[in-house]
Amino acid sequence: MPAPRYKSGSSKKVYRKAPGNSSIVHYRRKKQSKAVCGACGALLNGVPRGRAVEITKLAKTEKRPERAFGGNLCPKCVKKMMVAKARNF
């Protein structure tokens, strides 16, 4: 029976062979899903893939791109939005 901390859905089972040809189970943390654009759903470049604990240890400039809506929208959607706002202004 696994320990309660391993029964979570955030743990991933990894089967390993031990000496003597016995199979044992190791538990690993699952990787976080990649960041996606809020408007079109495209994958965002320059945004790290990791748990919140790992990302807080990074420098500010490593967490997301240094531009308008960096880390939330892809460059194409930002450009479309700015052009639309400029035309309606």
UniProtKB/Swiss-Prot annotation:
Region: Disordered, residue numbers: 1-22
Biological-process GO terms, alphabetical: translation
Superkingdom to which the source organism belongs: Archaea
Pfam family membership, one: Ribosomal_L34e
Key words of the record: Ribonucleoprotein, Ribosomal protein
InterPro entries tied to this protein: Ribosomal_eL34, Ribosomal_eL34_C_sf, Ribosomal_L34e_arc-type
GO molecular function (one): structural constituent of ribosome
A GO-annotated cellular component: ribosome
Family: Belongs to the eukaryotic ribosomal protein eL34 family.
Protein's name in the database: Large ribosomal subunit protein eL34
Organism encoding this protein: Methanococcus maripaludis (strain C5 / ATCC BAA-1333)
